[in-house]
């Protein structure tokens, strides 16, 4: 599977260190669960969203508490409790100011995973389905790829505005 675990961790680590709730909310609005290949990262992302929606601060302590409340803490590996995992996320970004760049890397890998998924599905449909089914799957996959490319283009525009 195509993934960017270091960029995922760096992005989440930046959000754990962002002091302005509006900044965190803005970045959370730009990502989807499917952008993250690591289910632990998805759990942290979900905890962050829950906290922001409740008007609570997002930091390692509040996120760990939310993971516990939601019962997701068990998702963390046996040798790495949620607190240790979150500490690793805090240490992941070389520069908190590069959060937008980490997000771009995550989104680029999302597009690549979408292409990979579509390619596998189209291969399967080509080998074993009717042409009508193949056309439907092709259209659906094309629409999803266009959506993902659109998200990437929107982020590229935002990135250009942030660097100026």
Question: What annotation goes with each model-predicted range?
Answer:
Residues 152-164:
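Phosphate-handling catalytic cores of nucleic-acid transaction enzymes
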Residues 1-111, 164:
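Noncatalytic partner-interaction/assembly domains of nucleic-acid and motor enzyme complexes
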Residues 99-136:
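A charged, amphipathic interaction segment
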Residues 138-149:
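Short amphipathic alpha-helical coiled-coil/interface segments
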Residues 92, 125-128, 155:
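Surface-exposed polar/charged interaction patches
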